[in-house]
Amino acid sequence: MLEQKEIVRYGLDDATFMIPLRIESADRMRNIITTLIYLCRNFRTNIIVYEIDQESIFKSAVVPQLEQALLPEEFSMITHIFEKSDDYTFHRTRLLNDMAIAAQTKVVVNYDSDIILPQLSYIKAVDFILNGYNAEDGRPPEPVKCVYPYGFGEYQIQCTPTDESVSNFINSNFDFNAFEGQTRKWDAKYGFCQFFDREEYIRLGMENENFISYGYEDDERYMRFNALSNVIRYNGDIMHLEHTRTSNSWFTNPHIEENRSLWEKLRVMSKGKLSEYYDNVEYAKVRRQQALDNGQEQSSTEA
């Protein structure tokens, strides 16, 4: 039984969490419920959940549980977008870009539906982008445009929870000891979540929509922003709630070879060539125009 509890929420009003979603199994449904309750109870922020499927499992099965667990002001932070589609392929990069264009905050967060960070990691990541990185010798803050809030290597805490341990975690105000015996340290590389300055994210091409389904988009994004922007990564842990995998989340998907070829092409480009590619690739030009149009619409509405 999930309980409503009111706890202190930290203000992350300048951030929008972007969560692409397809609920393909019972454990994926449990994961999105857990993640959203964690975000909504701990932070005052903005969340977009973009679901694409034949029917909205989020609306029929997730929302009732969220309404039971969250206070009205917490639940109101979630914007749910549903796109009806019979296409089996999950085009994650396209959904993320749709949400980035719709977002109206300085910071956008590419956020998987099954991850949890320590509270301080969220706060630090947003602060770095808004205020820069303060050098220890007293120099002016260095600009930060992208944050990876977890380390490279054994910083992933893989968790295989049960319904009971998830309920205990939530009802204990998120005591991670609720998962005792259900976790192991594992490899963390480039996925999970990233915090971006929204304008920089759009300028540098956001998610490359030519990566379809699963594979190599995380590697390419990390390479690109390290080459062309200002990135910080710090050695914190990240919890990954495990789940059943279909080909949409594994290397057996039918787009994997095309994704690999694109990654092999981009990874050897010089900074100049990489920048030129993202200045001219068609999807990115369309997205930048959408961002301009969206900004003009917001300005006229505010006026």
Segments predicted by a language model, with ranges:
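Short beta-strand-to-loop acidic/aromatic patch adjacent to the donor-nucleotide binding site
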Residues: 106-118
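Active-site-proximal specificity loops/subdomain of glycosyltransferases
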Residues: 58-102
